[in-house]
Amino acid sequence: MIISKVWVGSLALLAVVSMPLQAASPVTVGSKIDTEGALLGNIILQVLESHGVKTVNKVQLGTTPVVRGAITSGELDIYPEYTGNGAFFFKDENDPAWKNASAGYEKVKKLDAEKNKLVWLTPAPANNTWTIAVRQDVAQKNKLESLADLGRYLKEGGTFKLAASAEFIERADALPAFEKAYDFKLNQNQLLSLAGGDTAVTIKAAAQQTSGVNAAMAYGTDGPVAALGLQTLSDPKGVQPIYAPAPVVRESVLKDYPQMGEWLQPVFASLDEKKTLQQLNASIAVEGLDAKKSRSRLPEAKRMG
């Protein structure tokens, strides 16, 4: 799918319609080190700056533990996080709430506010969780849209070979959980185990049909999925936790900028899983576009808050 028209001159427009704020301290914006972290962190930076907020750029600060530690210690003021990670932050992995988008969001929002004085703003309607992606030609020919469809296809004897990491193949909450929920079982001849956990490698293997592979371990919003001709399968039974990205801001900072939630809400609301977020990730991971420039490919200027 072609990305919607690049909005041009929207920052200039926003500069006119947005009143600069005369607030105390600059807002320190951080993110995780991965592609999507860079993208979302830069989007937050852009929205705040378009409303006259002075910022400090700490995008791509580090891994989840590093960034999480930075915001709880006050080193960061705002960063994008995933709702499902609340299960691990608060050691509550068995609560079924994490497998429901709204329940998981409300739970992590409540816990973080109470324990850390962190406020979760409106999340994007996307899910960056473990999934299986199949080649689009296979998906279209066999009407594969969900993991339930995959279970049906495999029972019918459909040709299938999955590229995945050993962790995905072996972890009880990964492939085995999908097999149990959707009533299928892959044998060794249907699996290609690749070293590490890099989905870029598994997706590339499926795109190039390496060793007969036509499917790959992936994350729901992986950029290369659509760009390399693959399609993610939905998880209608909610086997995996929902990992919806959302801005997380320190309570004291939100008091200084009470409109921050209103500014960011329409932007994150526009980041739907397949039409926008995958394509924006692809513009970085596949096209090599700088994350700062990829921000400008958001669908419409009016969505910039």
Q: What spans do the regions from the language model cover?
A:
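Beta->alpha turn/N-cap motifs
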Residues: 60-64, 74-87, 104, 165, ...
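Ligand-binding "clamshell"
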Residues: 90-100, 105-121, 185, 210-212, ...
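Short, polar/charged alpha-helical segment
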Residues: 35-54, 176, 180-182
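Ligand-binding pocket segment of bilobal, Venus flytrap-like solute-binding proteins
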Residues: 156-235
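Extracytoplasmic "Venus flytrap"
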Residues: 26-44, 59-63, 167-170
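An extracytoplasmic/periplasmic, membrane-proximal ligand-sensing/linker region
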Residues: 36, 167-181, 258-305
